[in-house]
């Protein structure tokens, strides 16, 4: 018989473990519950406890990850690049309202929590020139 997870326990445990963005398999690993129990719990608490980033990817509502962290997990493999990286490094003076990333997958655009994330296709040979950076306690891939 499986134990019943309580929302406050789940929230506190995820925060204590530093899990701000997770998939159902991540949730299973953290709490040791079945896939069905995971799916039911996440579905039941998606309005109050979790933010659905996309199918199979969720964030805590109370302790949301930074946009850069979401950008790296939303559509992998990818790294933050183009206009967003140029603005972040102070190379262009304009404010950038879209997180732009490079990916080897097809070009896509997502809107999560009223924030736009754009992924531009590049060839596999060109998928380099990035480094890891700590943002909000989490590792993010960012163009050099």
Label the model's feature ranges.
Residues 61-144:
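Nucleic-acid-binding surface
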Residues 1-77:
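Short beta-edge/loop segments at beta->alpha junctions of small alpha/beta modules
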């Amino acid at each position: 018989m499986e134990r019943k997870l309580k929302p406050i326990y789940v929230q506190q445990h995820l925060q204590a473990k530093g899990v701000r963005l997770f998939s159902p398999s991540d949730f299973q690993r953290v709490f040791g519950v079945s896939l069905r129990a995971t799916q039911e719990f996440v579905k039941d608490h998606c309005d109050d406890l979790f933010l659905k980033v996309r199918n199979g990817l969720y964030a805590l509502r109370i302790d949301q990850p930074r946009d850069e962290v979401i950008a790296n997990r939303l559509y992998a493999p990818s790294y933050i690049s183009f206009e967003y990286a140029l603005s972040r490094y102070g190379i262009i003076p304009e404010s950038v309202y879209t997180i732009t990333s490079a990916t080897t997958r097809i070009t896509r655009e997502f809107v999560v929590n009223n924030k736009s994330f754009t992924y531009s296709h590049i060839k596999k040979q060109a998928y380099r020139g990035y480094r890891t950076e700590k943002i909000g306690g989490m590792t993010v891939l960012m163009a050099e």
